[in-house]
Amino acid sequence: MEQYKQEFIEFMVESNVLTFGDFITKSGRRTPFFINTGNYKTGNQLNKLAKFYAKAIYDNFGDDFDILFGPAYKGIPLSVSVAMALDNIYGINAAYCSNRKEVKDHGDKGILLGAKLEEGDRVIIVEDVTTAGTSVYETMPILKSQAEVDVKGIIISVDRMERGKGDKSALTELKEKFGFKTCSIVTMEEVVEYLYKKNINGKVIIDDKMKDRINEYYKEYGVK
């Protein structure tokens, strides 16, 4: 596993973004782990997060893109900070673009923030975590309504590796539906592998009991 992936996993734990216990998801699933990206709150955290995204984007796409698109609302600060990180680390001067939930009728009018989309622009969608892919299904019509852009793919922080609407993961369903590349900084499989019996700040994050619970969860909800 790449060094930056290991560092990202520890970063999520230390930021209290990734926690283990007993939780209920929005869809009603009882899960032994929870990912709350709302706990990235400080400038330091966002700076580090953006660097992890930048490294994963470069690993998966190189410099084959022009614009980072961040779906509102969480994708807005992501697209901005990751664009800055790409410039700082790799010298890639990508633009950022996001959508508004409400269209403005004054000043900077329209549905988009940031760069104007033009025909042929190569776009990467930057998301936090996708379970059902809902925001992407909402994003694609917005992109196509603005210009005939070339969506190269989507990058998320963690692939939960759970079934979407059918027996496949949400990312796999998006790939099959739209034909673009789907990738993540890490997968939950990598997370569990790295954190099993791993001591962070004096605490073992995933012990045998938690590992068994995670395995049972994926027997029921994991991708086949």
From Swiss-Prot:
- Signal peptide positions are none
The cofactor named in the record is:
Mg(2+)
Reactions that this protein is recorded to catalyse: orotidine 5'-phosphate + diphosphate = orotate + 5-phospho-alpha-D-ribose 1-diphosphate
An example GO BP is: 'de novo' pyrimidine nucleobase biosynthetic process
List positions binding 5-phospho-alpha-D-ribose 1-diphosphate: 26, 73-74, 100-101, 104, 106, 127-135
Q: In which pathway does it act?
A: Pyrimidine metabolism; UMP biosynthesis via de novo pathway; UMP from orotate: step 1/2
Q: Which GO terms describe its cellular component?
A: cytoplasm
Top EC class for this record? transferase
Cross-referenced CDD domains: PRTases_typeI
| Matching NCBIfam families | pyrE
Q: Which family does it belong to?
A: Belongs to the purine/pyrimidine phosphoribosyltransferase family. PyrE subfamily.
Q: Describe its partners and assembly state.
A: Homodimer.
Protein name, entry field = Orotate phosphoribosyltransferase
Q: Which organism is it from?
A: Clostridium acetobutylicum (strain ATCC 824 / DSM 792 / JCM 1419 / IAM 19013 / LMG 5710 / NBRC 13948 / NRRL B-527 / VKM B-1787 / 2291 / W)
